[in-house]
Amino acid sequence: MERDFSGSPRVIADLGRIIDRLEALGRLVRVRSEVDPRHDLAGIAARFEGGPQAVLFEKVAGHAYPVFVGLYWSRELLGALFDQPETALPQHVAASIKSWQSAPVDPLVVADGPVLEVTEAEVDLSTLPIPIHALEDGGPYFDAAVVIAKDPETGVRNASIQRFQVIGKDRLVINIDAGRHLGLYLDKAAARGEPLAFTLNVGVGPGVHFAAAAPAEAAPVETDELGIASAFHGAPLELVAGTVGPVEMVAHAMWALECEIRPGEVHAEGPFAEVTGYYARVEPRPLVRVKRIHRRRAPIFHTLLSGAEVFNSVGLLGEANVLALLRVQVPGVEDVYFSHGGCGFYHCVVKIAQKRAGWAKQAILATFAAFPPLKMVTVVDEDVDIRNGRDVEWAMTTRLDAKTGILVIENAFGHGLNPTFPNYLGTKVGFDCTRPFPHTPAFDRAKTKAMTLDGLDIVGAKR
């Protein structure tokens, strides 16, 4: 007997319904010509990157399933999906995480789900339309799939997003960022002489992605991060039990792969064009064995481009965490923004209405502590538009005292994908671009009267 899933769950929890919603809003482009998943698909997608529409490739050469890209490359698009102004997204995300922290809603394990509609008789990753994006990438990559694993000692679930290179019909290689809970789980399993089982969930909603991207500072190791997805959905996230392993799968995913990593098994991985705009180097990394593949009857493969899509997924979670912590620790903080020029999580601009001298530097230190991948923090006054690079540069050139306003922190932990942080250690810098406190008229911005052009007789104007 088949279960009817047509009325469940909320739109935000189901990728198929998300795509339908985007199309209804006029925010979906359909590419109906056949496209080669090796380089061509990414090259076409890049022409739309950062725009207000996502892209669905209906015909992928050599494959039976479509590919979707662009869910996260525009905050305007994300805002439309969440019914939020794009500038309010960090506050919306922060509020959802705070709701989870104060009243956690555990995921619900159900008996069945769309992801179990088909279980492949044979494990063959070549049947999935996994693209090769950049010209020098080492092969096809899963780059938008969510890993669910369990602590071998406590059984607590963890969600994360890692990159996986396909190297065979049933083999992958995983890159695990340093400091991630998944790496801790792998070490614990190896110490016990056991494989680490996990599931790889493809085509999930933003709530699950945001749960997976939540910084460790927001979701400590003893908590089940998947509850964050429940907070975004407004209802418990539905999971289904694994069929060959002990780890659950997202019930409404498009695909779910049951996998394991055995102690000591490694394989060369890379290169891969990362969010920094550089290729991650080839290194030996953990080998993954795929034990079983489940999918919907008509699945859609979700991929993302390493760029704006990472800025607006991982970066948005970073913004939300920094904003929530700064508002508690530093009086006067009004807003934060992770700039796209800073790869979405290396440069944070903080807006503050200073109440006391020295609080801008306090904000710099607190921001670095709230999100360790950051390399640079710039603090500006409340009269500066933090999302306007020209305005931030204006504050830097006219308000920064280069002798007293630059804070340099050497040998600090950072992000391994940033080439200036080899082995995760490097130098961080903070810029106090605020007016001297107490304020004087010398640093007041010149203003003109706010006027409307409505009703005026104007000829030849172009706006």
Swiss-Prot record:
Top-level lineage group: Bacteria
One Pfam family cited in the UniProt record for this chain: UbiD
Xref: SUPFAM superfamilies: FMN-binding split barrel, UbiD C-terminal domain-like
GO MF annotations, alphabetized: carboxy-lyase activity
Family of this protein: Belongs to the UbiD family.
Family annotation (NCBIfam families): UbiD family decarboxylase
Protein name: Uncharacterized protein in cooM 5'region
